[in-house]
Amino acid sequence: MLVSWKWLSRYVDMTLSHDELVDRLSLSGLNHEGSETVDGDVVIDLEVTSNRGDCLGHIGVAREIAALTDQKLKIPTIEYQESGSAVDDSLAVTNEMPEACPRYTARVIRGVKVGDSPEWLQESLKAVGIGVVNNVVDVTNYVMMECGQPLHAFDLAKVGEGKIVVRPGKEKEQLEAIDHRNYDLNDSTCVIADSSAALAVGGVMGGASSEVTEATADIVLEAAEFVPLSVRRTARRLKLHSPSSFRFERRVDPVGIDWASRRACQLITEIAGGSVAPGVIDTAPEIPARETVLLRPKRVAALLGLEIETAELDKILRSLGCEVSAFADGLQCVPPSWRHDLTREVDLIEEVARIHGYDQIPEDSPIPVAPSSKRRFDTAMERIRGVLTAAGISEAMTPSVVTEKLDQMISPWTELPALQTRTSMLEGARTLRRSLIPSLLQSRAANWASASLVADLFEIAHVYLPAPAGSDSALLPDETYHIGLIAGEDFFALKGTIETLCDRLGIPGELTVGPVQRDGFAKGGAVELTLVGDDAKEPLRLGFLGFVDGKLVKQWKLTGRVVAAELSADVLVNQSRLVPQQQAVSSFPSIQRDLNLVLPESVRWNELAGLVRKAAKERLADLTYRETYRNEKVDGPNKKRVLFSMELQSQTETLSGGDADSIINELVASCEKQLEAVLLR
């Protein structure tokens, strides 16, 4: 925004030097981009933010200067005479597009003499980079640069049947603008038209067919409000930007529309002669009142860190055009019509800080800061990511919406059909996935095809499990976080990773496995993971682990076997103990014992480990699986030997060999009774 020093001095006394002024304006939010001298005038280039459309005119900038320097703003007094027949006798206006043009006003001036503008007007426009056209057009540009309200003048004789219609453009309709280029219009374009053709693109630029020339005698003066989004879209589509569209995109003062129209009538009649027809055509004369905003001095002190007297707050807000009145806890403020950005208490506090001076805020002011902390869920997720990454598994991110074919490959959690979106989120994808494994399988195949032969992946994301029919939430899915994993051939390595994950999360109890059959997993190659003991009153289903069906592996053109797992993040987080619990280190020596048991083939390691822990209780310091050996000739069919090590230790005394033997004997007796075990001596 270019502003002229001479022009500003018409509205406010310029008591500051150039350097002082630009520094104060910069500190208050109007950044100084540069200055230059034009014909003895100093022109200042200011950066105006998108919420300060009121500063896109000299009066708006002068108002800021007056507030900063504690002076009165001098607004021009408007006086002119109306004569002749009423405006309704010469012109009719119809607004068929109020959603794009909420308000349209028009006045008629008869008998103007179009010619060159006076020297002072030409100098004012040239100083701020506006070209000189003729006295009527120059006045409309002058008023725009004065108050920020764009205006447009039509030649009344060129307005068909004296009718102006604000309407949508028509398909294949064209308009030659005043830049003498043709533009294609459509039904999204707000058009100012007469009874037969378009005369202007609303809020952007007028048309050549109705522009004011030296032959013009009667003019129609337009002053309107156009919706910013409509103007922005039209200007972008047509690649046609103008000073008018720039201002309409940032909103104009609805009350200032009439002021700008009357100001232009005054200047035109003074410079070009003519008479203003009595009255004005206004499609929306009723302007909604601004809502009251409360300002509390205590809140000002809390946010800025300094005390400002209520009288000073009152003075600052009045200097900005607010209507201020007192109430019990502070001030009631009605923002001025030109400040669309003042809607909340914090907005008023920002204005106080700007005018009072950001430099007045003490650097060491105690600003209250609300302490923040991570959610338990976020802390757990960080730890999970750390464990899985340390295990050499890379994190993947895949879409939550997949194809129906992909979702049906593996769904261990439910057999209910997946929910569908009404429209495809991705090409051909409308299904809210019920499992992460199919997406990870697809990602592993894509990595494999790109020569990334080691593509062990995990993902933490939502799955959407359909609710059973007839339940209260049948229309909405159970949207929960799951952890999906996919790796190479080693089933036990992935199981060990899951056990490590539970250990690092401090989950008490025991991770057990049980055979299960689910579509998508190899027959006899899948287990259900369950947490039992300690905090869990009942066994909790943690998830599933198993070999992917060979048909799917072949379908994705993968080699070797693929192991996949999916865990419930909610179960992991709810059972975790994220704050480590200190355990005393025993000062007494431990005893190591190795046991070799002959067991039925059906006995799983977790059953044996459970009996060991039950027998040794708190004296079991460590339990380590060593190996499994089978010899049908010696032990018989369906038998196996399991070798494991026990470390026994007490926190209160030194265990003797007899103590250790007693524990071992109790363990062996339990195994013989419950597992049909035989101890090899």
From Swiss-Prot:
What GO molecular functions are on record for this protein?
ATP binding; magnesium ion binding; phenylalanine-tRNA ligase activity; RNA binding
Name its cellular compartments.
Cytoplasm
Q: Which keywords does this Swiss-Prot/TrEMBL entry list?
A: Aminoacyl-tRNA synthetase, ATP-binding, Cytoplasm, Ligase, Magnesium, Metal-binding, Nucleotide-binding, Protein biosynthesis
Residue stretches making up the FDX-ACB domain: 586-681
Query: What's the EC number here?
Result: 6.1.1.20
This protein's cofactor list reads: Mg(2+)
Pfam families in the record, alphabetically?
Answer: B3_4, B5, FDX-ACB, tRNA_synthFbeta
Question: Taxonomically, which superkingdom?
Answer: Bacteria
**Amino-acid positions noted as binding Mg(2+) in the UniProt annotation, renumbered to this chain:** D341, D347, E350, E351
Which SUPFAM superfamilies does UniProt cross-reference here?
Anticodon-binding domain of PheRS (SSF54991), Class II aaRS and biotin synthetases (SSF55681), PheT/TilS domain (SSF56037), Putative DNA-binding domain (SSF46955)
A GO cellular component term found in this entry reads: phenylalanine-tRNA ligase complex
Catalysis performed (reactions): tRNA(Phe) + L-phenylalanine + ATP = L-phenylalanyl-tRNA(Phe) + AMP + diphosphate + H(+)
InterPro entries recorded:
aa-tRNA-synth_II/BPL/LPL, B3/B4_tRNA-bd, DNA-bd_dom_put_sf, Fdx_antiC-bd, Fdx_antiC-bd_sf, Phe-tRNA-ligase_IIc_bsu, Phe-tRNA-ligase_IIc_bsu_bact, Phe-tRNA_synthase-like_B3/B4
Q: Does the keyword Thylakoid apply?
A: no
GO biological-process terms attached to the record: phenylalanyl-tRNA aminoacylation
Q: Where are the transmembrane segments?
A: none
Domain B5 residue range list: 288-363
Q: How is the cofactor bound?
A: Binds 2 magnesium ions per tetramer.
Q: How does it assemble?
A: Tetramer of two alpha and two beta subunits.
The Swiss-Prot or TrEMBL record describes its family as follows: Belongs to the phenylalanyl-tRNA synthetase beta subunit family. Type 1 subfamily.
Q: What is this protein called?
A: Phenylalanine--tRNA ligase beta subunit
Its gene name is pheT
